[in-house]
């Protein structure tokens, strides 16, 4: 049976994302080569890093982890583990609308403490100030743990998920709580390196590059995409943890490694960068950006020139 680790415990948004992936697989919308998602065993891990390391160590076949929030930006433990840890590859992604529930058995104006995972607290800070100004915010180990803390009487209210509130049988005193409307988080399924899912025409490719320490090296790496009409949709810098002021760069681009323009850009990066770590090509329906230019017309024209045609 397939084993999929996820950033737990049960009831977190990450488990909800994994359940969504399994539902998409059951409907034939999502697939990972050589892995059966439907009916897979879900294994809770205490952190994003732990979930990914379970895959690297062979304790799980895949890991489901958050990678980017529309409010808070990159999920750095995920980026750093993919960038510096044992080689892993992204095979699929999904995203969730992120709105919280306030779990509490008492009216909100009577709550004196409200537990929140730090990332969640940052996303509902204004709502709490407006609706629960009397409540002290205390840290929770996770979104689901906030509901458990309420159920066990350690706090009066918790910023949690609807799934966790139901799981621990705590009433939802408020739902749809978020400072930013339509906030979303991307989640990815990662496994050991292998063949990428087939090109769909609506794909994402990710790499981590280490460029030489000289003027213009990052601009040159970015130009390898621009000159080929490949749309970069995300660029993140992360410290290398070796020399102060040195960084690697995470690039997401529109397209698949089997797209000629993307393949050419990756080969060029290998020539101009000190290191290139391929994080995968996978379907991303409805993702941002513009698809790579089809080189077919220019290749036909060029081949005609070689044949002496004008």
What would you call each of these model-derived segments?
Residues 1-310:
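Domain-level signature for soluble enzymes in the chorismate/prephenate branch of the shikimate pathway
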């Amino acid at each position: 049976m397939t084993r999929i680790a996820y950033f737990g415990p049960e009831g977190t948004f990450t488990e909800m994302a994994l359940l969504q992936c399994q539902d998409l697989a059951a409907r034939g919308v999502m697939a990972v080569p050589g892995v059966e998602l439907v009916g897979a065993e879900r294994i809770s891990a205490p952190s994003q890093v732990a979930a990914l390391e379970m895959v690297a160590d062979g304790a799980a076949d895949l890991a489901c982890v958050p990678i980017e929030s529309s409010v808070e930006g990159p999920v750095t433990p995920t980026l750093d583990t993919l960038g510096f840890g044992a080689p892993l590859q992204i095979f699929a992604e999904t995203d969730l609308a992120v709105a919280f529930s306030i779990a509490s058995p008492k009216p909100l104006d009577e709550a004196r403490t409200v537990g929140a995972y730090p990332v969640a607290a940052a996303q509902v800070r204004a709502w709490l100030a407006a609706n629960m100004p009397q409540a002290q915010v205390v840290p929770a180990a996770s979104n689901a743990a906030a509901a458990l803390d309420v159920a066990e009487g350690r706090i009066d209210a918790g910023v949690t998920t609807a799934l966790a509130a139901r799981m621990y049988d705590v009433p939802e005193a408020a739902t749809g709580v978020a400072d930013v409307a339509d906030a979303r988080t991307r989640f990815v399924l990662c496994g050991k390196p292998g063949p990428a899912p087939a090109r769909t025409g609506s794909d994402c490719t990710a790499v981590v590059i280490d460029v030489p320490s000289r003027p213009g090296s990052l601009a040159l790496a970015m130009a390898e995409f621009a000159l080929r009409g490949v749309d970069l949709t995300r660029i993140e810098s992360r410290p290398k943890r070796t020399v102060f002021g040195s960084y690697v760069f995470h690039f997401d681009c529109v397209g698949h490694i089997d797209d000629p323009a993307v393949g050419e850009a990756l080969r060029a990066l290998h020539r101009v960068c000190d290191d290139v770590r391929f994080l995968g090509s996978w379907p991303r329906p409805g993702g941002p950006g513009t698809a790579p230019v089809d080189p077919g017309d220019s290749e036909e024209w060029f081949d005609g020139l070689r044949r002496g045609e004008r």
